[in-house]
Amino acid sequence: MAPGERKKSSRKKKDPDAPKRSLSAYMFFANENRDIVRAENPGISFGQVGKLLGEKWKALNSEDKLPYENKAEADKKRYEKEKAEYAKKNSA
């Protein structure tokens, strides 16, 4: 292989029927607040939106984060259940 060339990765393709991963508390917060941040800061880049969302998340106290953490916990349980059903269905 010549210098600077990359080896093609041979990662297995993801099954489209596999259950979607659970979202974190931050992701629930970001999804809910992304449009608000964009409206308050028109014309900012995708990366800047992420930075602002991160700053807002860090500024929240644990009481304000609780609803998002509860959603994340519920989504994690959903994912675990769907993952178990998927594994059972595909192991046969």
Curated annotation (Swiss-Prot):
Entry keyword set: Chromosome, DNA damage, DNA repair, DNA-binding, Nucleus, Transcription, Transcription regulation
Family: Belongs to the NHP6 family.
Subcellular location: Nucleus; Chromosome
Protein name: Non-histone chromosomal protein 6
Gene3D superfamilies: High mobility group box domain
GO cellular component, one term: nucleus
Record PROSITE patterns: HMG_BOX_2 (PS50118)
Annotated stretches, region: Disordered: 1-22, 64-92
Keyword Amino-acid biosynthesis: no
Main location, first listed in the record: nucleus
Signal peptide annotation: none
DNA-binding region, residues: 19-87
Functional note: DNA-binding protein that induces severe bending of DNA. Required for DNA-binding by the FACT complex, a general chromatin factor that acts to reorganize nucleosomes. The FACT complex is involved in multiple processes that require DNA as a template such as mRNA elongation, DNA replication and DNA repair. Also augments the fidelity of transcription by RNA polymerase III independently of any role in the FACT complex.
GO biological process, one term: DNA repair
The encoding gene: NHP6
